[in-house]
Amino acid sequence: MQNVKLISHPLIEHKLTILRDKNTQPFQFRMLVDEISYLMIFEATRNLKVKDVKVQTPVALADAKRLTTKVMICPILRAALGMLDSVFTIIPDASVGFLGFQRNEETAQAEFFYAKLPKDAKERMAIIIDPMFATGGTAIDAVKFLREKGVKEIKFISIIAAPEGLKRFSEIYPDVEVYTASIDEKLNEKNYIVPGLGDAGDRVFNTL
C-alpha cells in the first residue's frame, strides 16, 4: 500500500498514548486531537505547489516562495471537527467542505446525510480529515463524492487506522494518499478499531 504514509514522530507517539487512555478527560482529548492534527498536517502538505516571488524585507529585496495550491479541508462530521482548527492554523486561507456520514450501528456502515462544498471545490486540492479510519467505507464514499464533483487531487488524514480499511481503500483508490499516525492491530466483530481509542466523536464532544 504505497499510498499509505505512516507518520512517525516522538511527539505524536507520546500524545497518541494519552489520547488512547480511557481515563483521559474530554477537554484533554480535544486538545490532543488538535495537537496531533497540527503535527500531521505538515507531512500531508509537503508537496503543495509554490511559485517564486520577490519580497521586500526591511533590509533588502529577497527571493521567496508563495503557495499557489488552493486547499479545501473536508472534515467528516462530526468527529473531524476536533481536527479542523489546527488545520486552519496552518492554512488560514483554506476553504471548508463539510461531509456528513453517520454510522449505522446495525450494519456498521456509514450513511451519507449532508454535504456543503465551496463553489470552486473542483479547483482545490481536498484534504479529508477524520480521526478514525476503520472499514474504509466512509473514506471510499467521501472520495467518490468529491470525484463526482470534479475534485481531482485528494489526500486523507486520519489519526489511527485499521489495516483492513486501508487495504480496501487502497485497492479502489491507490492514487489517494492516506496519512495516519498509527496502523492498529485489527477491526473487531463490530468493526471497531482494536486497540483503538474508543468513539472519537463521543470523546471529543463528551457525549459518552
UniProtKB/Swiss-Prot annotation:
Residue numbers binding 5-phospho-alpha-D-ribose 1-diphosphate: R78, R103, D130, P131, M132, F133, A134, T135, G136, G137, T138, D199
Catalytic activity: UMP + diphosphate = 5-phospho-alpha-D-ribose 1-diphosphate + uracil
CDD domains named among the record's database cross-references: PRTases_typeI
Enzyme Commission numbers on file: 2.4.2.9
Record-linked InterPro entries: PRibTrfase_dom (IPR000836), PRTase-like (IPR029057), Upp_B (IPR034332), UPRTase/APRTase (IPR050054), Ura_phspho_trans (IPR005765)
UniProt record similarity statement: Belongs to the UPRTase family.
Activation/inhibition comment: Allosterically activated by GTP.
Pathway: Pyrimidine metabolism; UMP biosynthesis via salvage pathway; UMP from uracil: step 1/1
Protein name: Uracil phosphoribosyltransferase
Keywords on record: Allosteric enzyme, Glycosyltransferase, GTP-binding, Magnesium, Nucleotide-binding, Transferase
Origin superkingdom: Bacteria
Gene Ontology biological process terms in this record: UMP salvage; uracil salvage
GO molecular function ontology, one term from the record: magnesium ion binding
Binding-site residues for uracil, renumbered to this chain: I193, G198, D199, A200
Necessary cofactors: Mg(2+)
